[in-house]
Amino acid sequence: MLRAIIMDIMDEVGSLRMSLFRRHRKKNLKSVSYTHLFPWEQVIPMAIAQTAGAFVGATIAAVFYYPHFKETGPDEGNCVGIFATGPAIDHKPCNLMSEIIATFMLILAILCLGKMVDGLAPVVIGILIASIGMSFGATTGYALNPARDFGPRLAYTILPIPNKGTANWQYAWVPFIGPLIGAGLAVVFFKLVAP
């Protein structure tokens, strides 16, 4: 998870001059359409690019950890949790609520940042992501973005990782739908209360 936070912050620092949407990619179709922060014609290509990027990142991790995977089995840590999110306790309604609330808080905070000085926004967003991880990470692993879970889960399924366990696809809808709902609700709430 620390790797994901560090990569997010590095991504933020590398994109300081981009729009609010591009400064933080944890938005979705609903928030894009409602806030008009991103052109519609770029929504699908951006979603595909994010998923492909997450897939490539998971592939790099699989190559890096390959010797460890050969020596371990699913009971020893060689599982999808290295790549994608998963529940500590499998209770879909609570897991979904955790993803909705975590994403709601993230998107609402990003929208509230508004015109914050570009150099400070990545720091604040990085701290926010770390805080959400400490608060909600134990319950579901906090996807916050469907691509962040789907791409690595797909990589885990496809790649020839030795001794691997199941990819837990029956859970995959939670980190996909939860962030979409949470971000959509955050945007609607922001529009209702913003001056």
Each model region followed by its residue ranges:
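Membrane-interface helix-loop junctions and terminal tails of multi-pass membrane proteins
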Residues: 1-195
